[in-house]
């Protein structure tokens, strides 16, 4: 059976707060993956998590921030800047923050599609939450 076409624009108000605290706006999905628009407000720090079953690809649209990720003895902090792309392979611990004055926005593709709120498992934070 053919998969229906889908076209979407991010909603003005977010659809859900992700388990890490970021604002999620739903975009199209197909059987192999789903897409969302993610926003982290200025001064915000996400909660550190790892995923149970999904890989993610991020593409930064606007704002600036930092991404911490760790997996199998590898660890790094990389800048999140417009037109940069980042991978979050299954089993990676990660956290991101927006120290800037503008919202940090990016598109996330999740493979397979995001299964629900229990997908993200809390891990120890790399950065403490803002006070």
Regions found by a protein language model. Name each.
Residues 36-37, 67-69, 106:
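Short hydrophobic/aromatic-rich beta-strand segments that constitute the beta-sheet cores
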Residues 72-90:
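Short acidic-glycine-tyrosine-enriched beta hairpin
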Residues 1-37, 47-48, 118-131:
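A short, N-terminal "cap"/entry segment at the start of jelly-roll beta-barrel domains
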Residues 23-34, 43-59, 73-74, 82:
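A short beta-loop-beta micro-motif enriched in histidine and acidic residues
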Residues 45-47, 66, 84-86, 90-96:
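Histidine-centered metal-chelating micro-motifs
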Residues 81-82, 90-117:
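Ligand-binding loop in jelly-roll beta-barrel domains
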